[in-house]
Amino acid sequence: MALSVPGYSPGFRKPPEVVRLRRKRARSRGAAASPPRELTEPAARRAALVAGLPLRPFPAAGGRGGGSGGGPAAARRNPFARLDNRPRVAAEPPDGPAREQPEAPVPFLDSNQENDLLWEEKFPERTTVTELPQTSHVSFSEPDIPSSKSTELPVDWSIKTRLLFTSSQPFTWADHLKAQEEAQGLVQHCRATEVTLPKSIQDPKLSSELRCTFQQSLIYWLHPALSWLPLFPRIGADRKMAGKTSPWSNDATLQHVLMSDWSVSFTSLYNLLKTKLCPYFYVCTYQFTVLFRAAGLAGSDLITALISPTTRGLREAMRNEGIEFSLPLIKESGHKKETASGTSLGYGEEQAISDEDEEESFSWLEEMGVQDKIKKPDILSIKLRKEKHEVQMDHRPESVVLVKGINTFTLLNFLINSKSLVATSGPQAGLPPTLLSPVAFRGATMQMLKARSVNVKTQALSGYRDQFSLEITGPIMPHSLHSLTMLLKSSQSGSFSAVLYPHEPTAVFNICLQMDKVLDMEVVHKELTNCGLHPNTLEQLSQIPLLGKSSLRNVVLRDYIYNWRS
């Protein structure tokens, strides 16, 4: 008999004794025979199994309170849980006889395909070359095609920064041109030689004519030419230019020399455009881009200039210089068009129209007899409201400005003399805007687009497969895009796909302009014969733009028929 110790509780058991009792209970429960499954399952569960409903595994009888045989205890079933509410997993094994058949693929396995079918508005400037989006190889569904099938692409006036062509046939013919082929391509470009390739080339690698034409289609003209600086794009290029050598940034004399040479080149380009010896050219500044087009292109009988994006300050400066312009994407409202038609309306006329609109807006208050109770906004408030509306569209596609006819010459002088054309601080300080042209001009330097054939991985049903691809990088202008597609149509037997990466501020150049009369295309082509473009390219650029504020982003050619998305 244990001695009575003060403060000792008789019900207290030492740890070894507790462990011994637990082992004894586990052995006694394991010895008891578990009842059959049919008896332990509730009637509702048996009915659900017969109906083929997915059920959770029913816990064993000995699972409550601990596992049998000293093993881990089974999870207790929630008595309030529904029998059919568990999430369905793709790799889950079948639970009942009704699920023995193999199931269809789980819907979320195709989510990547669905996302790819919705072409994104914006693409990264550069992606990994070894991974091509699957969308460039899928066929277009009917609602996604913006127009009927066509043998030609719509005209696209945006500048592309990168093209990625893919095909089932190799592009090895585009690599390692011979010295004679490279020289012949340069001569063909300088002499504007018209080359017509056959519909299909059996062996592109042995076709010297194809390789020379490919070299010809990669040439463009640039000013200024500074090989250590990326001169396109200029908008948002400060980070790429940071740390680069720029001796003119703090040298006013050198800046003056650069701007003088740039003014001569700019004037030379405009004179070529006016005489229809140059079809178009671009002026790329650090804030906006200007597209000058010759008369006859884009359905216009006059020289046109599009500026995008613009700000209220730039538009006010153009008004002060007497430049008549309009905002094509701003619709008419009330008595006047909400455009900045510089000198079409004088200040007095605009003020009179504004006062008339204000009187009409408050006329209904007088009819109700409450005009004295409503505080009429003063002229200053109305002016501030209008200025806020103008500022809100700054740097947006809606701020694109259109200049026509003789006003383009006034715009030329305005840009040459404008102090805000060149950055005064930052990596681009003192650097003149970039001039891009498809033909030679005074002070221009011949440049080449970079081309290389690579292999890309595309997702297939059995994993990944190799696809032949051709990558083009650089400032790809509209004539180069059309020339390359014509060339690849012959070399790839009328079948390829392409992903296009546009310079976003230039996508708005595809807007349709309101024309005064319909042009005779035969006369237009005859007048622009010496502009240096292939007749087929000239015919395409003469068409009225149809893409609006968007640009081509994906193109698929199958059996010489184009489908595209913008």
From Swiss-Prot:
In what ranges is there compositional bias, type Low complexity?
73-82
What inducers act on this gene? Expression is cell-cycle dependent with highest levels during S phase.
Which InterPro entries does the entry link to? Donson
**Record annotation: effect of changing residue 446 to T:** In MISSLA; reduced protein level; reduced nuclear localization
Q: Which UniProt keywords apply?
A: Developmental protein, Disease variant, Dwarfism, Nucleus, Phosphoprotein
Instruction: Tell me the residues on which Phosphoserine occurs.
Output: 28, 34
Record's subunit section: Component of the replisome complex composed of at least DONSON, MCM2, MCM7, PCNA and TICRR; interaction at least with PCNA occurs during DNA replication.
Q: Which protein are we looking at? A: Protein downstream neighbor of Son
